[in-house]
From Swiss-Prot:
It is found in: Cytoplasm; Cytoplasmic vesicle; Early endosome. Keywords: Cytoplasm, Cytoplasmic vesicle, Endosome, GTPase activation, SH2 domain. Belongs to the RIN (Ras interaction/interference) family. Residues 63-158 form the SH2 domain. Interacts with CD2AP, RAB5B, RAB31 and BIN1. Residues 278-288, 315-336 have a biased composition (Pro residues). Residues 587-732 are annotated as: Interaction with RAB5B. Changing T828A: Strongly reduced guanine nucleotide exchange factor activity toward RAB31. Residues 877-963 form the Ras-associating domain. Ras effector protein that functions as a guanine nucleotide exchange (GEF) for RAB5B and RAB31, by exchanging bound GDP for free GTP. Required for normal RAB31 function. This is Ras and Rab interactor 3. SUPFAM superfamilies: SH2 domain (SSF55550), VPS9 domain (SSF109993).
């Protein structure tokens, strides 16, 4: 039987929210996603460093069967264990479909669940899910370790899981579809009976265990993010808080999954609890230094520790077409179906009296329930939660009593001390489940608990993510404000009122002052990253500030935006309206009115540069991707930086001549010189800032290979052991306090991304050095011959590696048209001092720049003059993203002139993709699902610009593929229309 699953849950948006990431508040210095993934472990086998993603990519001929029909997929999956999957393409809708084996207790009623994989521009996601992915491999890899809306995690065949080398994976991949009937997929695996899963969603029937039985002490799952695309959101399993399931209780824990004692369990449950393994609650927060309660109940020492790995919390979206075997209790007909086994909440630090009081009345099924379990060890800092497409996932808890809702919420309390847990963010909830969680932390509300102690337990709602917890900091719909007001009205005043910015758990278990907690919550990166995504989902403007998806704001700007005091809510609708008026968006709009005209235009240019809907915005994004690819293959630091500077100059020339900028500029307010300076500063922020770390890394690598850094370090030690007289110093040198100020200036200069800002800091540093020189003989003028030895003395006591990178960065990346004046003099002097240190010789000490250094400076000045002249008459080099065979597959960003024809671009594609028969390949454009072939003399850049400017916005992809098939319609599709002009639609 085949069932379709994955429809959107009630209250969820019917379609995906466009990828968010343009708010400067959410900047996390990801640059072009160059951050290396962390390496936490989970419980999936991982041998010799082969990640799940690599295994999926290598074995895609086995599980990615686009041409298979529904019946054939069902035939294959009915013979394998639960959790096995295949991906096919629906012949009618042309959409990918994830087919998962889903048997019940009765093998004859086994099903194949089908989840539609939606595609929107550059993202993929399961229908009904909030998580978006870059490609099918990352999507499948994520669902192999976390189920989200699936009833359980996906399972790879045992042969793939146990493969220890790429040779083994190639052997499996060569079998293709025949793998499922081969000896590598043994009969005992295909036919072994299903057993209850260790990790399933409430309301789903039991299926076979998805966790492999192989033991491995080095289990891991990494998904490495690739560079070279303009996507902003990715889901990485190693960044998911609930990324793995529990191991079977009869197996010892893996080497990197520490054994943790489980809370006491109860046998007085329904008959289904005999075979339904219970999910342990998350560990409690760390015990505070001074307990909130002086009397703690004794801890039973006879609890046997059992292995347990972190479990994903249950999603509130059940599969709509699967009939559960364990219906919900009759007195709660609106609840999601669940297993009736009772779940004992894990004791939380600081809530000892609360839990003890809750366990006294009611039908306690076991004596162990009256005594809390020993506290579990605190977990490490949890990684960042994955991005979400929608604001909130509504959970229908209105029919439940407050006591049971509080018990359900206690099951999902995160451990205290995590840097990104919900307790570190403002808790202004709009969900009913969160209202009852606030009540659970209030001792005065506990007399309500005994009335519901005997009712069947309620499955815990999915823990609300950061992006949903911040909903109340923005203008919210009226119904959300009413819910929030009701929650505050229900709360009973306590001697110590809860502080904003902390969850109830942290309010009871921590002793931090309110100011510290508020500052911590505002400075957390999740607060910054979630604000823009939440606002975009609500359709509300967060701020009228720079919307920079690539972390292009300064540190000072970020601190200013989050330094405003938090507004304390009161249980009244008036305060809900006040919160709307006093939101960040309103504050930002008010301050925006006081900005100067130049500053306003600067912010508009920055917004335009990262608006992918504009032609200039797409040009900037493609340029950054191209620059990263270019830097990876450069061997000369000067050539690398010069190419970056040339591209920036061309981008500026294009924007100054484009109609996009003319629509933003008032000619009466801005002169041509001011306009050029504003655009240059905006490009520093939109281009250089996200590329800064990559540039420094490439420069460091290049200079390490040519021996420059090693030579600098060796001579630095020699100069440190040399007296000031031997260095040629005839004046005073900076004292220790002044030297500390100078080194602080150097540190600030290294952190800056703008070449002009770096030069400004360098000038201030040189002034400090001159002031130190004049201390010994005030009033005496000193020249360059006196300054150079002292500068060498100062540089030898600084970080020479950073100084070398900074000087080269400033010399090659600043605007060729910029008249530096004094800045140019001190920059070249610093360069000369570094060259003197690099080639330092005690015998030939000189107080002047050597001839070689002077020649090098003259070459640099000529290069600047030539670049300035070339920029005035050069054509803008454009970029175009082309995929191979299928849209968004093996995408490459190609650089070419705007007047390049399709035939020349095809030659570039043939070289880039290394095709064997380039004459049989052509360039196609897919527009809203329709395929068109570009004529040889067509201009792809003109077509790209036309499609970007068209209204309504169109989804288009350039694809390089053979003429006889592939891409949009498959081999049997009719021939595509050949187009030449941009307005072919």
């Amino acid at each position: 039987m085949i069932r379709h699953a994955g429809a959107p849950a009630r209250g969820d948006p019917t379609g995906p929210v466009p990828v968010v990431g343009k708010g400067e508040e959410e900047e996390e210095e990801d640059g072009m996603r160059l951050c290396l993934p962390a390496n936490p472990k989970n419980c999936l086998p991982h041998r010799r460093g082969i990640s799940i993603l690599e295994k999926l990519i290598k074995t895609c001929p086995v599980w990615l069967q686009l041409s298979l029909g529904q019946a054939e997929v069902a035939r294959i999956l009915h013979r394998v264990v639960a959790g096995m999957f295949l991906v096919r393409r629906d012949s009618s809708s042309k959409q990918l479909v994830l087919c998962v084996h889903f048997p019940s207790l009765n093998e004859s009623s086994a099903e194949v669940l089908e989840y539609t994989i939606k595609e929107e521009k550059s993202i993929l996601y399961l229908e009904g899910s909030a998580l978006v992915f870059e490609d099918i491999f990352r999507l499948i890899a994520f669902y192999c370790v976390s189920r989200d809306l699936l009833p359980f995690t996906l399972r790879l065949p045992q042969a793939i899981l146990e493969a220890s080398s790429f040779t083994d994976l190639e052997t499996i991949a060569n079998l293709g579809l025949g793998f499922w009937d081969s000896s590598l997929n043994p009969p005992q695996e295909r036919g072994k009976p299903a057993e209850p899963p260790r990790d399933r969603a409430p309301g789903f029937p039991l299926v076979s265990s998805l966790r492999p039985t192989a033991h491995d002490a080095n289990c891991a799952c990494e998904i490495e993010l690739s560079v070279g695309n303009d996507r902003l959101w990715f889901v990485n399993p190693i960044f998911i808080e609930d990324c793995s399931s529990a191991l079977p209780t009869d197996q010892p824990p893996l080497g990197n999954c520490p054994a943790r004692p489980l809370p006491p369990t109860s046998d007085a449950t329904s008959p289904t609890s005999r075979w339904a393994p219970r999910r342990p609650p998350p560990p409690p927060p760390v015990l505070p230094l001074q307990p909130c309660s002086p009397a703690q109940p004794p801890v039973l020492p006879a609890l046997a520790p059992a292995p347990a790995c972190p479990l994903p919390t249950s999603p509130p979206v059940p599969a709509p077409h699967v009939t559960p075997h364990a219906p919900g209790p009759p007195d709660h007909p609106n609840q999601p179906p669940m297993m009736t086994c009772e779940r004992l909440p894990c004791p939380t630090a600081g809530l000892g009296p609360l839990r003890e009081e809750a366990m006294k009345p009611g039908a306690a099924s076991s004596p162990l329930q009256q005594v809390p379990a020993p506290p579990l060890p605190a977990k490490k800092n949890l990684p960042t939660a994955p991005p979400r497409r929608r604001v909130s996932e509504r959970v229908s808890l209105e029919d439940q009593s407050p006591g049971m809702a509080a018990e359900g919420d206690q099951l999902s309390l995160p451990p205290q001390g995590t840097s990104d847990g919900p307790e570190d963010t403002p808790r202004e909830s709009t969900e009913q489940g969160q209202d009852t969680e606030v009540k659970a932390s209030d001792p005065h509300s506990m007399p309500e608990l005994p009335r519901t102690a005997k009712q069947p337990p309620v499955p815990p709602p999915r823990k609300k993510r950061i992006s949903r917890q911040l909903a109340s900091t923005l203008p919210a719909p009226l119904e959300n404000a009413e819910l929030c007001t009701q929650a505050m009205a229900l709360e009973t005043p306590t001697p110590g009122p809860p502080r904003e910015g902390q969850s109830p758990a942290s309010q009871a278990g921590t002793q931090h002052p309110p100011a510290q907690a508020t500052a911590h919550s505002q400075s957390s990166p999740e607060f910054k990253g979630s604000l823009a995504s939440l606002s975009d989902s609500l359709g509300v403007s967060v701020m009228a500030t720079d919307q920079d998806s690539y972390s292009t704001s300064s540190t000072e700007e970020e601190l200013e935006q989050f330094s405003s005091p938090s507004v304390k809510k009161k249980p009244s609708m008036i305060l809900g309206k006040a919160r709307h008026r006093l939101s960040f968006a309103s504050f930002s709009s008010m301050f925006h009115a006081f900005l100067s005209n130049n500053r306003k235009l600067y912010k508009k240019v920055v917004e335009l540069a990262q608006d992918k809907g504009s032609y200039f915005g797409s040009l900037v994004q493609d340029y950054k991707v191209y620059s990263l690819e270019m830097m990876a293959r450069q061997t000369s630091s000067t050539e690398m930086l010069q190419e970056i500077r040339t591209m920036m100059t061309q981008l500026k020339s294009y924007l100054l001549q484009s109609t996009e900028l003319k629509a933003l500029v008032d000619p009466a307010l801005h002169s041509e010189e001011e306009l050029e300076a504003i655009v240059e500063s905006a490009l520093y922020k939109c281009v250089l800032k996200p590329l800064k770390e990559a540039i420094n890394s490439c420069l460091h690598q290049i200079h390490s290979k040519d021996g420059s850094l090693q030579q600098l370090k060796e001579n630095q030690l020699v100069i440190l052991a040399t007296t000031t007289t031997d260095l040629g110093v005839t004046t005073s040198v900076p004292e220790v306090p002044m030297m500390e100020k100078i080194l602080q200036k150097f540190t600030s200069m290294h952190k800056a991304y703008s070449p002009e800002k770096k030069i400004s800091i360098l000038l201030k540093t040189c002034k400090l050095i001159y002031d130190s020189m004049a201390l010994g003989n005030p009033g005496k003028p000193y020249g360059a011959d006196d300054f150079l030895p002292v500068l060498m003395y100062v540089l030898a006591r600084s970080n020479l590696t950073e100084m070398l990178l900074n000087v080269e960065y400033m010399m090659e990346l600043m605007d060729p048209a910029l008249q530096l004046g004094e800045g140019s003099y001190y920059l070249t002097t610093t360069y000369g001092a570094l060259e003197h240190i690099k080639s330092y010789d005690k015998i030939t000490v000189t107080r002047q720049l050597s001839v070689e250094v002077q020649d090098s400076i003259h070459r640099w000045e000529r290069r600047r003059t030539l670049n300035k002249a070339r920029a005035s008459r050069s054509s803008v080099q454009d970029f175009i993203c082309v995929s191979y065979l299928e849209p968004e597959q093996q995408a490459r960003t190609l650089a070419s002139r705007a007047d390049t024809q399709a035939q020349a671009l095809c030659a570039q594609c043939a070289e880039k993709f290394a095709v064997e028969r380039p004459q049989a390949h052509r360039l196609f454009v897919l527009v809203d699902g329709r395929c068109f072939q570009l004529a040889d003399d067509a201009l792809p850049h003109c077509i790209k610009g036309y499609l970007l400017r068209s209204e309504p916005k169109r989804d288009f992809h350039f694809v390089y593929r053979p003429l006889d098939g592939g891409g949009g319609g498959g081999g049997g599709s009719p021939p595509c229309l050949v187009v030449r002009e941009p307005n072919f639609l």
